[in-house]
Amino acid sequence: MSIEALKARLPDYAKDLRLNLGSVLTTSSLKPGQVWGAAIAAAYAARNDDVTRAIVAEAAQHLDAAGLTAAKAAGAIMGMNNVYYRTVHLSGNADFKKIPARLRMNVIGNPGVEKVDFELWSLAASAVNGCGMCIEAHEREVMHKGMSTENIQDAVRIAAVIHAVATVLDAEAALSGQDGSTAVAA
């Protein structure tokens, strides 16, 4: 599955998403590897088979093996951390903030790529997963490492569009009685 095939499957009511998917992946203040790493992490968070396949296939042209693995790892570890820390953040129980998480997160300390890139990709996944505490932490890290507000906005725009595309494809699949990986838009 290619990005163009994904765009072709979007129904006319999602034309804005079709156009945005092309633009956020090609027009950015980010380096190409940063764009595609953010896209992978967002696709993992969005959980649509075809979106993930298309994004990872295209990203393989822009990232080396270490970058692909690190972007997948960002999506994976944020799948855990975003649930945990969103609960800590939103719970009325102040004790949660005092107790150690006791969850392995070694990949954050040694992602195999530049730390700023991994943090940016984690921010993209956190935006999809809606963890405010994680968004703030990753935003602070990338800003501290020299990224601009525009860089952060571009990563979040990528995440937003990928999430929306996955949502539409899943909804259209549900309406047609198919699973999310085989739907065809009318």
From Swiss-Prot:
Top EC class, one word: oxidoreductase
SUPFAM superfamilies according to UniProt: AhpD-like
Molecular functions (GO terms): alkyl hydroperoxide reductase activity; disulfide oxidoreductase activity; hydroperoxide reductase activity; peroxiredoxin activity
Enzyme Commission numbers on file: 1.11.1.28
Record GO biological process: cell redox homeostasis; response to oxidative stress
Keyword Oxidoreductase (UniProt): yes
Record has Protein transport as a keyword: no
Residue stretches spanning the membrane: none
Disulfide cysteine pairs (residue numbers): C131-C134
Top-level taxon of origin: Bacteria
Chemical reaction(s) catalysed: N(6)-[(R)-dihydrolipoyl]-L-lysyl-[lipoyl-carrier protein] + a hydroperoxide = N(6)-[(R)-lipoyl]-L-lysyl-[lipoyl-carrier protein] + an alcohol + H2O
Record-annotated active site: C131, C134
Keywords of this entry: Antioxidant, Disulfide bond, Oxidoreductase, Peroxidase, Redox-active center
Pfam families, per the entry: CMD (PF02627)
Family classification: Belongs to the AhpD family.
Function of the molecule: Antioxidant protein with alkyl hydroperoxidase activity. Required for the reduction of the AhpC active site cysteine residues and for the regeneration of the AhpC enzyme activity.
Protein name per Swiss-Prot or TrEMBL: Alkyl hydroperoxide reductase AhpD
Species whose genome carries this gene: Rhodospirillum centenum (strain ATCC 51521 / SW)
Origin organism lineage: Bacteria, Pseudomonadati, Pseudomonadota, Alphaproteobacteria, Rhodospirillales
